[in-house]
C-alpha cells in the first residue's frame, strides 16, 4: 500500500490545528439523478442499516433505489434555496462562525472546515485539503449532540478510514457527544425562550429526535438515553414540569420497530386528549434540513391540524445562532487545551533542520 505523504512539507511552516465540523450529508441537487448515488452511499453504510449485506444489497438495489430517489427529490425541492441544500448552507455558516471565534481567541493557527459524511464535500477530500494547509493536530466535531452509531460512529469510521491511508498521522481528538453540555443546553433553552417571547407558549412542547431501530438500543447504543437526558435538562432550564413536554422520535422507515413514541403518531392523537396547541423543537439536529423543514415543519403540521389541532409551531434549529456558535467554539477550545501551550518558532525549527541536512 502506498501511503499519502506531504511531499511539499517545509520546516519553516508553522504547524496548524485542524478543526473539522461534520454533518450527515446532502445530494448535489434536488433531482432523482442526484439522489440515487447519495442514497446509495448513505443506505449502504452498515452503521446505518445493520442487515446482512447480500440481503440488503438485493433490497437496496432492487427496490429502494428504484423508488425512493424520485420521492426524496420532490421533498428536497421543497426546501432547496438559492444557496442549495439548507444543511450545507448552515454548515458553511457554522464553520465561518467557529473559525472567526477561534481566530479571535487564539490567533491565526486554525484551519476550520466542514464536511459531510455522505455526498459532498466529502470527509476524505476535506481532510486532504486540511493536511495540505499544514495541520498537524486535528479536532473532529460531528454535529450530532447525542451519540449514535449510525451518525457519530459512522463519522469516526470514515475519518479513521482516511487516516489509515496517511503516512503522518495528526494528534487526534474526537468529540463523540455533547448532549448534556451546559452551553449546548443553554443555547437550546434560549432559542425556545426567544420563540415564547414572540409567540407565547403552547399546551405542550414536543422534543422530536431522529429515530433509530429499537434493537440498536437493546444492543448497547446510548442514543436513546442521551436524548432523554437532553430533554430533561432542557426542561429543567426552562422550568417545565414533565407533563408540559413530550420526547418523541421521527423519520422511521421500514417495517422494524423503532424508538417510540413516534412523533407523527403522537401528534395525531394529542387533539383527542385535549391538546390543541403544540410547539415542536428538534434538539438532536444542529441545523435545519429536510427532516426538520419538510417532515416536522410541513408534513407533521398537516398531521396535527387534520387530527383536530388548532395551533402548530415549529421552533427552528440552532443553525448559526451566535449562542450556538459560541457553544461549539467552547467545546473545541476544551479539546485543544494543552495544544496551545508550547508554540514552535518555525524559523528556529527551519534553522535546526537545515543544520541536520534538510533540503534548502
Question: For each predicted feature, which ranges?
Answer:
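Active-site-proximal alpha-helix that buttresses catalytic centers in soluble enzyme cores
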Residues: 1-360
